[in-house]
Every structure is written in C-alpha cells, then in structure tokens.
C-alpha cells in the first residue's frame, strides 16, 4: 500500500534553524548577564521545546524567575529574527515537491510554538504543506500521539 501522508518535524529535519536559535538563546543570556553558549552547545540542548532549551542553556542554579525572563527575552528576539539564517536543508524543497506531485499529503508537527511554526512553514514551503501544527499551552507535545 502506498503512503497517503507524510508528517515531518520542522527544526533539524526540514529546516536548519540552529543559527537563529543560537542567536536568540545568546541574546537572552546576554541580557541576563549570563555566559553565551556555542552553536554546538545549543545544538546539544535542543529537544522538547524552548522552555527546556533555555533551562539547559541557563547557568546551573538559575531560578524560575530567571527562566521566565529568559523565555520572554528569547521569544521577543526570536519572533523578530527567526528567518535571519534559517533555511531548508539541501534537497528538502525538491523532496516535498516530488512527494506532493505523487499525491502524498504533507504536514508538520513540531514542539516549536505554533505561532512560530506557522510563519516558517508558510515562508519556506508555501502550499506544499496541508497542515502545520506547533506546540500550544493547552495541548500535548510530541511524541504524544494525540498531537
């Protein structure tokens, strides 16, 4: 039986977002007078959404107030700068076009906030994706099957 649909993750699968994520992490850390993180450190901290990324990026012993401030700073910066260096990985647009031409419905499910997932998918993949779902405060996150 041929596949009817294909669902992809966004960060690190379809899009290389590491540069913009690193810049946003380091902006927040700098504003809080914390040491900056390297690109490789940020790469190792990614997984399970931005709150976890920032917990891993903040210095040991950072309290919840510092985490809250880092979240606000990161979100504001990333919202304005999330496409500075972000781009599809080589071959991804071609792959999605071929799958779509073969009648396979395409979608994205991401732990990235929904308000960031939507514009990134529209900008880089346009009408190729039938749906793009990101994390919301009132819903489960991947890998929960209900997402």
Where would I find each of the regions flagged by the language model?
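Core-facing hydrophobic residues within beta-strands of well-ordered domains
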Residues: 3, 96, 128-130
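Short alpha-helical
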Residues: 20, 49-52, 94, 115-116
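Substrate-recognition "cap/lid" segment bordering the active-site pocket of phosphatases
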Residues: 84-87, 107, 113-147
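Catalytic-core regions built around general acid/base machinery
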Residues: 91-104
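Active-site neighborhood of HAD-like aspartate-dependent phosphohydrolases
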Residues: 1-44, 55
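Metal-dependent phosphoesterase signature
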Residues: 55-94
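Helix-loop "lid/cap" segments that line or gate small-molecule binding pockets
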Residues: 28-29, 49-64, 120
């Amino acid at each position: 039986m041929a596949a009817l649909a294909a669902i992809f993750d966004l960060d690190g699968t379809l899009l290389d977002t590491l540069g913009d994520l690193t810049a946003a992490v380091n902006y927040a850390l700098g504003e809080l007078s914390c040491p900056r993180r390297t690109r490789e450190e940020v790469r190792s901290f990614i997984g399970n959404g931005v709150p976890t990324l920032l917990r891993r990026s903040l210095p040991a012993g950072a309290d919840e107030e510092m985490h809250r401030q880092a979240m606000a700073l990161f979100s504001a910066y990333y919202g304005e700068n999330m496409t500075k260096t972000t781009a599809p990985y080589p071959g991804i647009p071609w792959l999605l076009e071929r799958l779509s031409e073969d009648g396979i419905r395409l979608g994205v499910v991401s732990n990235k906030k929904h308000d960031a997932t939507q514009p990134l998918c529209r900008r880089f993949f346009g009408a190729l994706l039938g749906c793009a779902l990101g994390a919301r405060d009132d819903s489960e996150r991947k890998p929960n099957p209900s997402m």
